[in-house]
Amino acid sequence: LGVRIGDTVTNPKEFVRLAGTRATARSFDDRAGSTAQLVALQSLDLNALDHEVIFIWSTEEEVGLVGATAVADELGFTPARVHAVDTFVSSAAPVDRQNFAFTPLGQGPVARGLDSSSVTPRAIIDGLLELADGHNLPLQLGATNGGTDGTGFRDWGIPHMPIGWPLRYSHSPIELIDLRDLVVLSDLIQLIAEEW
């Protein structure tokens, strides 16, 4: 084939709407999260804020949290909380074992209470669940492997609870999402910024 170690190879990206509210494409992780944040930021009522809110986009999460760690080191203050917005790899696919990371698509975004690099304090979990419930937003609570950019803030003692959307077939050319989960995620991000 003429392909050698070190050669760059890419798959073409194509967003495909499926039946109902499902869509498939390559690289929803983390383009979908960026979209949810941008929509929340555009909808944010700046006059409603009585505290500082910072939205951060960083790079190289998959190869050592390079961007997030640099931001955490440079902020110069201690945020009350960090909510990394990232994929939640769901075990709700037909062939997956459903005893871990079971978060069905179309049933709302996911608050990550536990992963391989963090344990969210109970008060943060309860506060976020209360916020969502008070606004009738569906929110799933999940535990999974892996980690997020929020881990870059751990060394500073800053509590973090990643939030995201359930996704099947992560890091493949056919990642699968339910667009309703992204809409609710954007609403949740806006609520966190304005009210919590």
Where are these regions (language model features)?
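Active-site-adjacent substrate-binding region
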Residues: 102-186, 191-196
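Acidic/histidine-rich catalytic neighborhood of metal-dependent amide-processing enzymes
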Residues: 3-5, 10, 14-31, 35-110, ...
